[in-house]
Amino acid sequence: MYIMKQSGWLELICGSMFSGKSEELIRRIKRATFAKQEVKVFKPAIDNRYSSESVVSHNGTSIVCHAIASPEEIFQYISKETDVIGVDEVQFFDETIVGTLTSLADQGYRVIAAGLDLDFRGEPFGVVPDLMALAETVTKLQAVCSVCGSPASRTQRLINGKPASYDDPVILVGASEAYEARCRHHHEVPGNPK
C-alpha cells in the first residue's frame, strides 16, 4: 500500500480583527520551516502598521515577508524550491489575488492566506468570500467581544470613540481610527440600511 502526499492546496484563515489570524499564519509558516520546507511570505504594500518588511501579529510575533503592490509580484519571488506560500491581509488585494492563489495551488504549492472575512460594516470583505469557497480548508477564528466577553465575529471601527458610519470608506489608509472586536449584538453601524 502506498501513501500519497497531496500536492498543492489552499488554506484560508479568516475572522475579525484581534482573532489571531496573523498569529495563526505565522505559526503555520514557522512549523513549515521546522520541517525544512522553503517558505515565502507576502503582504500588501499598503499594510505598514507595524513593519513594511514583516507580518506582525497584534501580540508581537512576526515573520519576514515581501510587501507587494499586486498579486502577480508573488511569481517574481518563488521558485521550484518553494514549498509554502503565505499571504497576510489578503482582503486588501484586488480580485486578481483569487486567480493567483488558485494557480499557485494548482502548480503544487501549499498556499496559506489570512484575512478579514467581514468589513467594519459586517459585510463580506473583498475577495475573501471567493477564497473561502475555493479553499480546501477554512479556519474561521473569533476574538472576544470588548463589550461583553462573548465570542466576537465582527470588527467595530471607532472614530473619536464613536462607531463609524455605514457611509465611511471600507478601506482607510493612514487614518486615526481605532478598532475593537465585537459580537453580533454589540456591533454598531449607524446608518446601516438593513
Swiss-Prot record:
<dbReference type="GO" id="GO:0004797">
    <property type="term" value="F:thymidine kinase activity"/>
</dbReference>
<keyword id="KW-0862">Zinc</keyword>
<keyword id="KW-0479">Metal-binding</keyword>
<keyword id="KW-0418">Kinase</keyword>
<keyword id="KW-0067">ATP-binding</keyword>
<dbReference type="GO" id="GO:0008270">
    <property type="term" value="F:zinc ion binding"/>
</dbReference>
<dbReference type="GO" id="GO:0071897">
    <property type="term" value="P:DNA biosynthetic process"/>
</dbReference>
<protein>
    <recommendedName>
        <fullName>Thymidine kinase</fullName>
        <ecNumber>2.7.1.21</ecNumber>
    </recommendedName>
</protein>
<feature type="active site" description="Proton acceptor">
    <location>
        <position position="89"/>
    </location>
</feature>
<dbReference type="InterPro" id="IPR020633">
    <property type="entry name" value="Thymidine_kinase_CS"/>
</dbReference>
<keyword id="KW-0547">Nucleotide-binding</keyword>
<keyword id="KW-0237">DNA synthesis</keyword>
<feature type="binding site">
    <location>
        <begin position="15"/>
        <end position="22"/>
    </location>
    <ligand>
        <name>ATP</name>
    </ligand>
</feature>
<dbReference type="Pfam" id="PF00265">
    <property type="entry name" value="TK"/>
</dbReference>
<feature type="binding site">
    <location>
        <begin position="88"/>
        <end position="91"/>
    </location>
    <ligand>
        <name>ATP</name>
    </ligand>
</feature>
<feature type="binding site">
    <location>
        <position position="186"/>
    </location>
    <ligand>
        <name>Zn(2+)</name>
    </ligand>
</feature>
<keyword id="KW-0963">Cytoplasm</keyword>
<feature type="binding site">
    <location>
        <position position="148"/>
    </location>
    <ligand>
        <name>Zn(2+)</name>
    </ligand>
</feature>
<dbReference type="InterPro" id="IPR001267">
    <property type="entry name" value="Thymidine_kinase"/>
</dbReference>
<feature type="binding site">
    <location>
        <position position="183"/>
    </location>
    <ligand>
        <name>Zn(2+)</name>
    </ligand>
</feature>
<comment type="similarity">
    <text>Belongs to the thymidine kinase family.</text>
</comment>
<feature type="binding site">
    <location>
        <position position="145"/>
    </location>
    <ligand>
        <name>Zn(2+)</name>
    </ligand>
</feature>
<keyword id="KW-0808">Transferase</keyword>
<dbReference type="GO" id="GO:0005524">
    <property type="term" value="F:ATP binding"/>
</dbReference>
<dbReference type="GO" id="GO:0046104">
    <property type="term" value="P:thymidine metabolic process"/>
</dbReference>
<comment type="subunit">
    <text>Homotetramer.</text>
</comment>
<dbReference type="GO" id="GO:0005829">
    <property type="term" value="C:cytosol"/>
</dbReference>
<dbReference type="InterPro" id="IPR027417">
    <property type="entry name" value="P-loop_NTPase"/>
</dbReference>
